[in-house]
């Protein structure tokens, strides 16, 4: 038996001509009444067959015939007189079909020769190995289930236009195995997190996506209108305040994995719609949260990739090692050691330095900023991008942490952390502020900042204050950016690579 090399014929006509020719083939199928049948049920998957019979040689398969039924997309085809081959791809992988008129009948074989790459086909047959050792299905029954009207990208060039990969993700998934692997890893990551949380006695919940008051984060919301209630609503920027209401209600460990929406810029790290996991545990604090978060991320890597040592953009990252912990000023002085303690406590010096880095300190967020907020801004300019290894930055200032519990020992700071890896924030957590009077005062301060022009300052949420007045136990809470975590685990340079359908400008 002669076996072809797996190549794809060159396109000889433009795409419009190809589509026209395929529509004509579809018209003929409609006339025959067999255009889109739905009565074939595959019983096997390509990857399962490849794995199960990996050690079965040609003689073994001939001695013990294995009948299979498989369906998928035809990715390659080579017609060679009275024997033809096709590579068929299903959701698990690929397997080769061997087709002859003696096996499937002359009419079916003639029809098969007219089928196109991208068509969805199905076969029943017997497994065998070719002379080159490739596991194949000797087709006894062959059917066309769905006609592809548009041609797939050329095998050797693939889908090279990056924006087209995002815009037509369905094509990207067909032709790019690495893309399929990325989203399988994403699914495994989220499944691992759910299992980890379940094992730690957390209850998964769902809270509203439409909020009467945006809260739980410093961000600009999307605004909509509820017609029946005739009221302005906001797509949620965070679920935090609802989840903490559940802590008040007696659910002592809760978590949610869901979408957040922020009407802000698009970048390699930001998408207006993104997935967040937030969890809250009564009778814990931010130090417990750091230990728990470290264990969760390490386990997610192991479950998704089989290892806690990963490669990201050509550099190794070992999640098995203990994560570092630094204060904001310690991080600044580690990566910009010329700064003295005195300079980092000098308002005028900090503002001058921020100007040198191109920060507009005249914007509303900086007008009444204290030392802590200025230190944080300098940290973002000098140290944040340098935090390659997993590092918890701790002890954030009160003025930028309106929902976090204040430190009992150090005035002006909170029991808060942010986790950084590869120079980007992955998680944010803190001991929760459960003093209703302190929380009300901080909300009022946020309202003052909003009135001064800070669009990201929080609103005053009177119902949340009312909930706290019923008493919330000491609590720790944390949010983990699922998209950024998956970027890390899949070696993806941009958030668009880990979103199935990222937001893009309208197509012209």
From Swiss-Prot:
Which HAMAP family would you find in this protein's record?
Lys_tRNA_synth_class2 (MF_00252)
Please name the GO terms of the biological process aspect recorded for this protein, alphabetically. lysyl-tRNA aminoacylation
Write the Enzyme Commission number(s) for this entry: 6.1.1.6
Q: Which GO terms describe its molecular function?
A: ATP binding; lysine-tRNA ligase activity; magnesium ion binding; tRNA binding
Keyword entries, A-Z: Aminoacyl-tRNA synthetase, ATP-binding, Cytoplasm, Ligase, Magnesium, Metal-binding, Nucleotide-binding, Protein biosynthesis
The cofactor(s) it depends on are:
Mg(2+)
Assembly behavior: Homodimer.
Question: What is this protein's name?
Answer: Lysine--tRNA ligase
Q: What class of enzyme is it?
A: ligase
Question: What PROSITE patterns is this protein classified in?
Answer: AA_TRNA_LIGASE_II
GO CC, any one term: cytosol
